[in-house]
Structure formats: C-alpha cells, structure tokens
Amino acid sequence: QGWKTYWKSPGDGGFAQKMTWDNSTNVKNVNILWPTPIEFEILGLTSLGYENDVIFPLEIELEDEFKNTFLNLHVTYLICKEVCIPGDATVFLEIPSGEKKLTNNYFELEKALSLLPDEDFNSSYVNKINLNTFYDDKDSIIQLIVESEKSFFSPKIFLHSPFGLPVVKNTINYSDDNKIITTNFNFDNDLILDKNFPL
C-alpha cells in the first residue's frame, strides 16, 4: 500500500512507463492507454500518476489479423514510496489467429477501460475547446476555454506534453450556467522559458 507510479506526463519527478516490442512478430504498433491520473507529492515533488494499483490497457495493432502473433514486450517503470525504485519486466504473449474469444481477464479489462478519459466529444457532451497561450515578464500561461452541453461540476483537467511540463495548480472560472469553463495554468518563466518549452 502507498506505492505510486507515473502518468504519461509525470510532472516534476519520476518518469512514465516505456515499452519496446522490437522482437515481436506480426506487431505493427503497441499503444499504452492511460487511465485518468491523480495528483500527489512525493519526495517534495508534485507529480501525476497512480497509487496502490493500476491497469494500463494495451492497444495492439497487428500487421496481418489472419496470422499468428507473438508479443515480446519490454517495459521499464518507476515506483515510489519513501524511496523510488526503477524496474523492468519482459512480457511474452502468443495470440493465435482465428475466432476471437473472451478471456478470464475480460471484466478486469473492461473496468480499466472505463477509467480512461473520454476522448469522444459526442459522448462527453463537450462542444468546443479553445487553447490560448500568453506570457509576460513573470509567467507563461496556458488557457483552456471549454464549452459543454451540460454543466460542469468539479472538473479535473490535466495537461499532457512531451516536454515534461511541471504540475501547477490551475484556476477555473465558470459561466453563470456552468456550461463554459475557463481554466488557466500559470507557469513560472524560470521553469518554462529557460528550458525552451514551446508554448
């Protein structure tokens, strides 16, 4: 209990899980699907990730669906509590061609998929997202304006960037009917511009 691992944009500390599948057969691509993270502090650093347990569903794209598949997946990861421990593991999986059948892990997988952020505007009721960036002598600001068919109640908004943005507290302003929110992420220029983060 209490062990943590990291989201795809981990924040100030840690690193996300990384995978390679070089020695696989009939595998074109493997994509990690990331459940909605939580924010936590560890060793004085604010990060985004998961606590105690998490399942990362994998989306595997085959080169030919009518051929047998052998997955040789190498994973590197980091888990933290009072200390951080890096680790690695290799997973082997044979996927025969032919009729598809449900496995004993089907319900666990469905549960994990239900924890993924909804990227479908139609099912999430989000109509529009505008992204703006500003900066002055002190701060660089990423602003999101989100419009929805339904009212927002305590939304959680996380920024993903391949450039390793630090985690900062965002401010949220609501329209009178709570169907439009404006949220600002303010980054200290010393943390952003000096490291050449593109905004």
Pin down the residues of each PLM region.
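Extracellular/lumen-exposed scaffold segments
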Residues: 1-199
